[in-house]
Amino acid sequence: MTGRICILVMDSFGIGASLDAARYGDAGANTLVHIYEACKRGECDIEGARKGPLMLPNLAGKGLYHAAMASSGLPFIDLATLAIPSGYYGYAVEQSLGKDTPSGHWEMAGVPVTFEWGYFPDKPYCFPEELISEFIKQCNLPGVLGEKHASGTIIMDELGEEHIRTGKPIVYTSADSVFQIAAHEEAFGLQRLYDICKIARNLVDKYQIGRVIARPFTGKPGSFKRTGNRKDYATPPPEKTLLDFLKEDGREVIAIGKIADIYAHQGVTQEIKADGNMALFDATLSAMKTAPQGSLVFTNFVDFDSSYGHRRDIAGYAHALEQFDARLPELEVLLQPNDMVFIAADHGCDPTFPGSDHTREHIPVLVFGPQVNSKFIGRRDCFADIGQSIAEHLQLSSPLTHGVSFL
């Protein structure tokens, strides 16, 4: 075994529209560049938090802006003013058909999603009548609220009071392959919410739905707030992923945040939950202090997507990026001689775009560590190149089927 791997997934941090973006209604999307330009125009100031241009010195030093320029061709920054990147840098193109969390993560771990997910139409009462009636029956519910495409925070404010009064959970979806259930932790019960999500998971399988998501909230009308007790019930990957092969090989696979949920808890040896990007970074640092040789520490930083991308909060996204960037030196000092850190994303979610959905984009691929020299790895034709490179570095005995190593 040689060294350890740490993967940091900046959920939704795309760096330029993919060639097929127009098929998804996402032509021109660019999460990073549009945030960068909004900051440059002075549109992302937050009193007491951030002001002026986007400042990401650590990510820039690892090649983020070089990768973004290669991805989109947009001259948003003068590369001549930047130092030569200190690690591997490039961008990757998604082969999976979706632009969702499971597709991006599974492909990254060696399993592109080549089948079509099921989706619910964007219309009132969007769920099949058979599905809802069976859900109500099996869960012994008085009914449901919502039944439409919606932003989770908006529908929570819209229907939260009625939910508490009637005991009916709020069910909704989006452009992703999801069946989401929101309920008040005290009035409805957190465990009860989890229980009905498990029932829903079985019911939506026939519709090829990727995830059932529990969306608990607390508070009173006018001040409802989501809690950190979200739980994703994902359909399992169709093939063994990098995580499965590592676990079978006797390695430690430490899943932080929602990683275990994304892989349906397969291939994971340890699960660590944390709420919020900074708590997730703290958990990552703690794991890296004790992770043995040959192990994988895998963290998803969900706030970029759920708190800022979907909510089209450009300033909040910029601030979150700067907070993340500032923590990277804390991770670097914990690295052992043969360790590698991979920074990537799973899709885009351009906060300057209309609507509230993900955007079809390239993702950054940045790799650094004590023994990693500067190298432009160019365009990677599949997210699975990340998994294949990790498999090579960790000397995994079972090679992945997809992807080409760039090490």
Curated annotation (Swiss-Prot):
SUPFAM superfamilies: Alkaline phosphatase-like, DeoB insert domain-like. Its main location: cytoplasm. It comes from the Bacteria. Mn(2+) 1 binds at D11, D346, H347. Mn(2+) 2 binds at D305, H310, H358. GO terms for molecular function: magnesium ion binding; manganese ion binding; phosphopentomutase activity. Its EC number is 5.4.2.7. It catalyses: 2-deoxy-alpha-D-ribose 1-phosphate = 2-deoxy-D-ribose 5-phosphate; alpha-D-ribose 1-phosphate = D-ribose 5-phosphate. One of its GO terms (biological process) is nucleotide metabolic process. Pathway: Carbohydrate degradation; 2-deoxy-D-ribose 1-phosphate degradation; D-glyceraldehyde 3-phosphate and acetaldehyde from 2-deoxy-alpha-D-ribose 1-phosphate: step 1/2. It is found in: Cytoplasm. Binds 2 manganese ions. It holds the Pfam family Metalloenzyme. Gene3D superfamilies: Alkaline Phosphatase, subunit A, Phosphopentomutase. Transmembrane segments: none annotated. Its cofactor is Mn(2+). One of its GO terms (cellular component) is cytosol. Keywords: Cytoplasm, Isomerase, Manganese, Metal-binding. Isomerase that catalyzes the conversion of deoxy-ribose 1-phosphate (dRib-1-P) and ribose 1-phosphate (Rib-1-P) to deoxy-ribose 5-phosphate (dRib-5-P) and ribose 5-phosphate (Rib-5-P), respectively. Belongs to the phosphopentomutase family. This is Phosphopentomutase. It comes from Legionella pneumophila (strain Lens). The gene is deoB.
